[in-house]
Each structure stands twice: as C-alpha cells, then as structure tokens.
Amino acid sequence: MSTVSDYFGCLVFDDRVMKANLSADVYASLRRTIDEGAKLDASVANAVAAAMKDWAVAHGATHYTHWFQPLTGITAEKHDSFISPAPDGGVIMDFSGKELIKGEPDASSFPSGGLRATFEARGYTAWDPTSYAFIKGKTLCIPTAFCSYGGEALDKKTPLLRSMEALNRQAMRILKLFGNTDVKCVRTNVGPEQEYFLVDKEMYEQRKDLIFTGRTLFGAKSPKGQEMDDHYFGVIKPRVAASMEDLNEELWKLGILAKTEHNEVAPAQHELAPIYTTTNIATDHNQLTMEIMQKVAAKHGLVCLLHEKPFAGVNGSGKHNNWSMATDTGVNLLSPGETPYENAQFLLFLCAVIKAVDDYQDLLRLSVATAGNDHRLGANEAPPAVVSIFLGDELMGILDAIENDAPYSGTKKTTMKLGVDVLPRFPRDTTDRNRTSPFAFTGNKFEFRMLGSSNSIACANIMLNAAVAESLKIYADRLEGAEDFETALHDMIKKTIKDHKRIIFNGNGYDATWIKEATEVRGLCNYPTTPDCMPHLLDKKNVDMLTAHKIYSVSEIQARCDIMLENYCKAVIIEANTMVDMARKQILPAVEGYAAELAASVAAKKAVAPNLACAYETGLVTKLSGLTDQIAEKTDELESAVLELKNAESVKEESFAIRDTILGKMAALRAVADEAETQTSSDYWPFPTYGELLFGVK
C-alpha cells in the first residue's frame, strides 16, 4: 500500500523531477531563472521542454496547455497535442522550447475592459517558471501569464508577479539598512483557507437558481439551521468524508499541501486549509483546489458550492488569506526577534503593514468586491465592510508605549527606545483569534478575512503587496539618508503609530457601534457594496501608487474597474432573470395548483354538507390567492426594472441602478415567494427546500 509520501507531487514537474531529468548545467541555469529572475537561454528552454515532454508522456499525457488566469476569475486552457507528423506517415511526440515559453491563444472572448479592439484577437501566454508544471488528466499544464498583443496584462498572474517583485525591491532596501547582507530576496507567502458547501447532486439539479447562479434565490428558512452549533467541528458524514479523502489524494498528487479539513458552522458547510507557500504558487494551487473540489464532489453524487452566500439565514463562505513576508534565508519578517535590532526590524515591517492598510483601505475593500461577497460582508458572520486591523492587547500595549515614550508593563526598562532597550519577547499565542476582524495579526502573519470563497486570491494579494511596498519605499527613502539611523528609525515608527492607529481595533467588529465609531469618529471608509467601492480604484492616490510600482498601467487599472463592475452587473442580472423564470414557471403554477386543490376540496365538502364552514381551506385559499397576486406583481416589477437597465449610459450607472433598485425588488419578490412556500403543501412545491438541501447529505 502506497503512502502519501510515495505519491505526493507525482504529477508535478517539480525540483526533484528537474534534478533527475536535466543536466547539471541546465538545472543550474533554470534554478537561476526561478530564484533570481535570470533570463532563460533558448538552449536551456529546449532542454527543459524535451525533459518535460518525456516526463509527461511517461505519465500518460498526450496534450499540453498554457494554463492561465484571465479576468473571468477562473482558469483557462487550450489543449494542443504533442504529435508531429513523421516522414513515414506516423507521428512523433514533440515539444519545443518555443512552445514551452510562449503561446498564442485567441484573446477575443476574454474580458479586456477596452485594452484591445474587437478585431485584435491575438493574445500571448508566457511561461511562469516559478510555478511548476503539472499533469491534469492527460494534459501537461504549464502555468503562464496572459497579455494582449500590445503587452497589456489580461490576467491576474502578471500583476501579482509584479506586486511580489515590487515588495521584494523595497523590502531588500530596508533589510540592507539592518545589515542583512546574506539575504537575496523577500517573498510573500500565503495560506488560503477555503470554505465551501456540499449538497446532493440530484437535489441541486432540481434548482435552476443553484445551476444558473450558484446560490438559492428562493427558500424559506429551515426549522433547524445552525442554532445548535452542532455542525462546527462535528463528525464528518460518510459521503462527505469519502469525498474529502479523494480530494486530499488528488491534491497531494498535484503537490498541493492540503492540511486541515473540518465541518464549518453552517449545515453542509466545510473547510479545507493548506500549508502556506509562495503567493503566486498559492494562487495557482487555490484555483486548482476549487476546480478539483467540484470534480471530486461530482464523483460522489455531490455538488460543491463555492458561492459566498448559497443559503440565506446561515453563514456564507469565505476564504481567509494568511499572509506573511519571509527572506530566502528563512526569516519571517513578521516574527518578533531575539535582539533589539531584530525587534526593531519586526516593528518596522509591522508598521509598514499598518500604514499600508490605513492608507489603502479602499484598495483592500475593492480587491474582495463581488456580487456574491456583498451578501457576506457585514452580515454578522463575516468581517464588516469597514477595514480595520486587530493586533491584540499585548502588541498594542507595546505600540502605545513606543508612541508615548512610556514604560511598558511587560519589561523592566523605563522607556521603549528602539535599538537601545530589548523589546519583550512575546509568544505567538498572546494574540487572540478575533474572528470579527477583517485583518488580524495572528502571531507571525496577518489573516485577511474579507475574501469571498469563490474569489481568486490574486487581487487581494496584489493590492496588499503593492500597499506594503509603498510603505517600505517611504521608509527606505527616509532611512537611507538619515544621519542617525536608530533615532530616525524610532521616530518613524513612533510617527506611524500616531498617524495610523485609527485603523487598529481590537473589539467586536460585528457591533453596530463600531461601524458608527469607525466612520464618524475615526474617519475610516465604509463601502457596503461593489458599486460603492469599485470606482475608488481610479482615485488619483491609488492610480499613482499602482503605476509608480509598475503593478498596472493606467489603462490596465481602468480596464479592471470596468470589468469588475461589468461582472457585478452581469451576475445580478442573471440572478434577477432566474428569479423571474422560476417565479413564473415553477412557483406560481405550484401555489395555484395547491390553491385549486383546496378550492376543489371545499366544493366537494359543501356538495355533501352545504353547511360546513371549511374555514381552514377557505382561509388558506384566500391567503394563497393574495400571495400569488403579489408574486405575479413583483415578478413583473423586477422584469421591468431589469429591462430599464439598458438605458444606463455607463457600467457605473448600471451598477448603481442595480444597487439602488434591482436588489430591493429581488428581495421583495423573494419575501412573498418564501411566505408562499411556508403555506404550500410539500407535495406541490416544485424544488427541494432548505431543510432538504442543508440536511440531505448523509
């Protein structure tokens, strides 16, 4: 029987495989490209391509694809076979360095936000050698970036790699000031915890809303939900456990470090957490994880729902983005050190994050903005839409002492002067796990909790990396010219604490009084919906910062703003149209059918005994008749409102109309339809109920 260590990464062209299949010179050259970004020689590319092809064919692969992440939010691939014609009429298996490095898929059907004209169909994919190639089915998948004919990024990987390089550049400047001469690079690492729901496939296929939108648009509350807290960390049901076992095996074969699995708070909700890895690799792995979750679930007669809010009345699903910075020598820059200098270095990087989050709250908020995630944020199950940082009382006490040049209770020293007095060592576990905080320090990393479950983690990490890079640049510019480094360092950390402590909040983020304090007293941003926050991507300070660090060009920023608003509008319009369709073709006929049966029952009874009151039946018929009138009326109103959207002069105007009008009409239609469900016989109700969906998997 094979063990996990026997087959882990068996479908990945990783470092072990490269060492075994490449010559020493080729391997060393490729490692320099991966580790230092050195240019890849054509002869090396050819050797790597040949070895990659031979390895893939030996594992049953017949095709290869440049696997990329366009602005749709999911992955894309076009499969080409390895075969080339041979002179004797047969075929040979061939794969060149040119085919490895560059591809030319048709870009015309991917979102571009105006970055290319309709007739400019050509796009390019370029190999990302830092993310290992892997085999999926019979296809060798080569992780790539995707750009237009003119060179503009049309994907999520390209700006992510740019943001990682921007942070690396600025962090290296800081580390040199602290005398870290052995460090060659700084990488950001991420471990994204993935939440999801599993429902029975047969039930799923009876619900148009789940099929078309990924969430239920109608559904009365189940008699039981998550009130008993008996699902969280509870015993995993056999079908779910079997699916999880298969999922782990598939992920491990692809070198994905799936570590922890458990039941989440809501019925039918679960979580998978991996071990952290370099950000661009973690992004690739998370995209793969979501894809494989859905495929494996289907094999077990289940459907994996990744929507942020598939069911009203119970928790939705998020994705916690555990983010840290580390040197190539293995030093976590968000871990307190042993010496005064190490502690000062830690505090400087900590303050860089605090400053970044405060200065660019809007970018962090819009980086997680989608129609689905708008249902979660601020709903007493997820962090609020207001961005704040949780540090814990002990770390906050240290920062207060530094700001005020005051004694800190955790040390015998009289003042907290950096570089002179040793800051107290505090274990990682002294920071509580504040689940209500959007951005929490958890000992040696920050946990960004606002991401939606179906989101790519790329955008959130792009904005976070870029914002921190900007803070570090400001610090490096000041410190590099300082006459007295220690004094300048102390003063700068002190100033950061004073200027940006408004973003720090250690209390209950669900409390309504916090939102009032945050916005009215502290002046923090509160953008409840995607249309509220997305236009701020174009604010001058944001455009200036993102272009200065070469994360995006101005045109790329404008394109992404338009695309995100378009995606929002399209998602909600599909939901609205689905509601109209379900109301007219399923709900109204079902309620009318039940009312007709009741009316027939009354007529039959009165034919036998004319003096019978039949109060129950007549009362219910009257109520159902009133509800059907309301459902029909509100369905017509919703349909008309959707048609009115065509008059919007811009995607921004359309998104505002959806926020202000469409969502309210959808909620009004749902309210009366859900009321009708509670009054209609289950024999007549046309699709599975919440109780059946949430508790139907055994």
Language-model segments: what does each one mean?
Residues 73-89, 108, 207, 214-216, ...:
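Short linear, low-complexity motifs centered on an aromatic residue
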Residues 7-120:
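Active-site core of metal-dependent hydrolases
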Residues 120-306, 315-318, 325-562:
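Glycine-rich, acidic/polar active-site loops that bind/position phosphate-bearing ligands
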Residues 1, 5-16, 165, 169, ...:
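Flexible inter-domain linker/hinge segments
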Residues 44-48, 68-70, 98-99, 146, ...:
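Active-site-proximal loop/turn and secondary-structure-junction residues that shape catalytic pockets
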Residues 493, 498-698:
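C-terminal amphipathic alpha-helical interaction region
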Residues 84-118, 229, 352-353, 476-484, ...:
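Short, intrinsically disordered, low-complexity segments enriched in Ser/Thr and Pro
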Residues 61, 65-69, 285-299, 325, ...:
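Hydrophobic/aromatic-rich, well-ordered segments within soluble, folded domains that form packed cores
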